[in-house]
Amino acid sequence: MAGGKCIALIAHDQKKDAMAEFARRNQDVLADWHIVATGTTGGRVLDACPDLKVTRLKSGPLGGDQQIGAMIATGDIDMLIFFIDPLTPMPHDVDVKALTRLAVLYDIPMALNEATAERLIKTLNH
């Protein structure tokens, strides 16, 4: 994936519908990018937008967050969009913190909510 444009998409369970809708609304822009996503999120995005190039990794609790973190560290991810659910307790909260830390450390654009994601998406392909 080196040299390509790649966006990582992750969404907590209560935000997966919002992520699928976000992808559907922005599929014209996302079509020019390769997408990696945690397993269930990637499946939901593909259901909404079957023509997008999506690589599904493991589910977040099974290591998908760490797979995306490793891709950030190797320079294979250019942007992270992670719709978090602040109202639901997360048993894998440390994974969220680790992923956020890597995005900050490697200085990649990161959105943790839909409003920020919409603004970031508008900067692509310009």
UniProtKB/Swiss-Prot annotation:
An example Gene Ontology biological process: methylglyoxal biosynthetic process
Residues annotated for substrate binding in this entry: 12, 16, 38-41, 59-60, 92
Organism: Rhizobium rhizogenes (strain K84 / ATCC BAA-868)
Alphabetized SMART domains for the sequence: MGS
Gene from which the chain derives: mgsA
Protein name per the record: Methylglyoxal synthase
Its EC number(s): 4.2.3.3
Sequence similarity: Belongs to the methylglyoxal synthase family.
Gene3D superfamilies documented for this protein: Methylglyoxal synthase-like domain (3.40.50.1380)
InterPro entries, alphabetized: Methylgl_synth (IPR004363), Methylglyoxal_synth_AS (IPR018148), MGS-like_dom (IPR011607), MGS-like_dom_sf (IPR036914)
Catalytic activity, as annotated: dihydroxyacetone phosphate = methylglyoxal + phosphate
Keywords: Lyase
Catalytic center residues: 65 (proton donor/acceptor)
Major enzyme class: lyase
Recorded GO CC terms: cytosol
Any single Pfam family the record assigns to this protein: MGS
Keyword Lyase found: yes
Domain annotation MGS-like: ranges: 1-126
Summary of the function given for this chain in its UniProt record: Catalyzes the formation of methylglyoxal from dihydroxyacetone phosphate.
